[in-house]
Structure formats: C-alpha cells, structure tokens
C-alpha cells in the first residue's frame, strides 16, 4: 500500500535525540491528526511542541511513542488520529486503529476475546482446577 501522507509538521524547538536515524535502516512511524486550532501538546520524546491548525504529520521512531501521543491528543478532544508504519523502501502500512474503531470502543463486527457469560462469583473454585491444566477463566460454565 503506497499511501502518501500529507500534513504540516508541528513546531518543535528540540530534537528527537537521533532516534529517527535508525529509521533509515529499519522503519519509522507516522501519526497524522487534524487540529481545530494551534495549541501546545507534550511530545512523547520529551519537551513540548505547538501543533498547527488543520492537518498535522509527525514522524517518530517507535509505535509506542505514537500511541502515547495519541492519548495526549485524546485529552485535547482530538480523536481522528491515525498511525502508520513506514518501511525503508517507502511503503506505508496503516496500523492503528486497525479496523477504524479504537480498541476500547464497541464495534458490532468485533469478536469478543476471552468472554465468559458469567459473574466473577460464578467462576469455578481454583482449587478444583489446580492440576487439570485448565485456567479458571477458560473453564466451562457450571
């Protein structure tokens, strides 16, 4: 997927500490978002920057930094951010949110993972399952 990313880089007086040098050999990450106004936000690499009004684009060395910046943006009521992985050959892959809905939100098509239709008090006694090889959360309903 060769998607071209567009947007302005936020105004930042510091540096990434050379973290993006590794991206020339391995990979880097980009986060894009739209801001209704110019405002200051905390950079995940340290320091503060001023985002521009409209479309913003920022390159970071790690996916975790993009996720951390996304949580900063959500505090500022900006929820339209997207995270991309950019490979050294220029190929771009959209990685977060994978199906367009954030993980903590309900999506009608999303499958439930490790869901048991019971209350915590209805879990089986762990002492009875101790050497059976079955975890309490995986045990069938009584």
Swiss-Prot record:
Q: Which domain of life is it from?
A: Bacteria
Print the keywords alphabetically. Answer: Photosynthesis, Photosystem I
| GO biological process terms, semicolon-separated | photosynthesis
* Any Gene Ontology CC annotation: photosystem I reaction center
Matches recorded under SUPFAM superfamilies: Photosystem I subunit PsaD
Is Zinc-finger there in the keyword field?
A: no
The record's section on InterPro entries has: PsaD (IPR003685), PsaD_sf (IPR036579)
- Please state which protein family the record places this protein in: Belongs to the PsaD family.
* Function per UniProt: PsaD can form complexes with ferredoxin and ferredoxin-oxidoreductase in photosystem I (PS I) reaction center.
Q: What is this protein called?
A: Photosystem I reaction center subunit II
Please name the source species: Mastigocladus laminosus (Fischerella sp.)
């Amino acid at each position: 997927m060769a998607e071209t990313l567009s947007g302005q880089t936020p105004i930042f007086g510091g540096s990434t500490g050379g973290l993006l040098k590794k991206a020339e050999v391995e990979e880097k990450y980009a986060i894009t978002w739209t801001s209704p106004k110019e405002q200051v936000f905390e950079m995940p690499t340290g320091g503060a920057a001023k985002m521009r009004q409209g479309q913003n684009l920022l390159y970071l060395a790690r996916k975790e930094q993009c996720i951390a910046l996304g949580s900063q943006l959500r505090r500022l009521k900006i929820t339209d951010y997207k995270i991309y992985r950019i490979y050294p050959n220029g190929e771009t892959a959209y990685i977060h949110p994978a199906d367009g809905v954030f993980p903590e939100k309900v999506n009608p098509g999303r499958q439930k993972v490790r869901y048991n239709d019971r209350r915590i008090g209805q879990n089986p006694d762990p002492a009875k399952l101790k050497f059976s090889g079955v975890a309490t959360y995986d045990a069938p309903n009584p």
